[in-house]
């Protein structure tokens, strides 16, 4: 029996339990909330994610897994869903104790067994075939119910690629699907930090040349054996953390490629990737510019 679970990494002021089972899909190797049996958990701490569907899904899953009388302790930054937490939990029929701390709202509830609406929240936030997208995806996954404009730009400008390659930050597999249209591609590693993205990609990309890895690109081992890499690296709102992520992707791509191998990269126009590309690659060619995005082909 799992006794204590944790979802995400709450700030230390909330005293996250050290020995709890981690259940965040964004932490490779963690246990999936979905895999926990009903009523098998004594206490749960959830650092609630910012998306509404994703958050209600995580809360409903945690409540489902809790035993009656078990405690759910949830917090979120005020402007990242925290101010809606209490209402959302009350909508499940729970009595909620709310406090404010460190720009967060924290809610404590005890499972009664009479909660309502858990199944509906789980269905709305689960992996699903997205209408109009013709793909499987899940709320919380990057651009989960649409084709990202940056990836679309890259897909439109890339030539047919050849040999062994990887898609760093593959999401639910939109770009990889286009890459695999080239018959000269012999293998493609789809890699993402988000388990939900990797699971969706596995369903979307049914191709014997594809393999799937739930991993952090920054800590991948690089063998320098790939012919090509495509990537629409994480950027979010262009904060400094995101910029560093993109820079780490570029460096890792250079390590993973063989000499002469090529990286096809799309970045938000405001992100200054040029210096990092020039430092890690022999030749960097702008490959298009439009719609707020810049494309690059970089050769090792
Ligand atoms: C801009 S999105 C591109 C997704 C996909 N190519 C698409 O077009 O839908 C970047 C992806 O990188 C993933 N990601 C973020 N940090 C990562 C990391 N450290 N290692 C691997 N993937 C990461 C995100 O989960 C997200 O799916």
Q: What are these model-derived regions, one by one?
A:
Residues 52-130:
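N-terminal auxiliary segments of SAM/dcSAM-dependent transferases
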Residues 229-255:
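Mobile active-site "lid"/loop adjacent to the S-adenosyl-L-methionine
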Residues 1-29, 148-231, 237:
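Conserved SAM/SAH cofactor-binding pocket of Class I
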Residues 41-47, 226-234, 264:
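Short SAM/SAH-binding signature in class I
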Residues 77, 192-195, 245, 268-269:
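Short beta->alpha hinge that forms the Motif I/post-I loop of the SAM-binding pocket
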Residues 94-103, 136-138, 283-291:
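Conserved S-adenosyl-L-methionine
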Residues 101-162, 171:
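SAM-dependent Rossmann-like transferase core, predominantly class I methyltransferases
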Residues 57-68, 247-259:
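A short glycine-rich, Lys/Arg-flanked "PGG" loop and its adjoining helix->strand segment in the class I
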């Amino acid at each position: 029996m799992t006794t204590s679970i944790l979802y995400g990494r709450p700030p230390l002021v909330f005293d996250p339990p050290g020995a709890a089972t981690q259940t965040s899909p964004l932490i490779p190797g963690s246990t999936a909330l979905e895999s926990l049996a009903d009523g098998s958990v004594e206490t749960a701490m959830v650092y609630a994610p910012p998306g509404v569907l994703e958050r209600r899904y995580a809360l409903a899953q945690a409540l489902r897994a809790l035993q009656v009388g078990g405690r759910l302790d949830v917090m979120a930054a005020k402007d990242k869903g925290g101010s809606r937490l209490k209402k959302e939990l009350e909508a499940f029929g729970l009595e909620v104790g709310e406090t404010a701390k460190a720009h967060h709202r924290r809610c404590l509830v005890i499972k009664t067994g009479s909660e309502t609406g858990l199944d509906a929240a789980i269905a709305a936030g689960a992996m699903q075939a997205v209408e109009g997208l013709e793909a499987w995806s899940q709320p919380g996954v990057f651009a989960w119910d649409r084709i990202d404009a940056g990836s679309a730009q890259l897909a439109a400008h890339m030539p047919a690629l050849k040999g062994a390659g990887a898609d760093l930050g593959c999401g639910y597999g939109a770009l990889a699907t286009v890459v695999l249209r080239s018959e000269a591609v012999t293998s493609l590693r789809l890699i993402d930090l988000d388990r939900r993205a990797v699971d969706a990609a596995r369903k979307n990309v049914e191709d014997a040349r594809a393999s799937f890895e739930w991993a952090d690109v920054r800590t991948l081992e690089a063998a320098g054996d790939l012919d090509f890499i495509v990537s629409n690296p994480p950027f979010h709102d262009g904060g400094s953390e995101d910029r560093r992520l993109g820079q780490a992707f570029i460096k890792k791509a250079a390590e993973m490629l063989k000499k002469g191998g090529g990286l096809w990269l799309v970045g938000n126009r405001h992100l200054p990737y040029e210096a990092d590309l020039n430092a890690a690659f022999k030749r960097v060619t702008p490959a298009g510019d439009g719609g707020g995005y810049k494309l690059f082909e970089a050769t090792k």
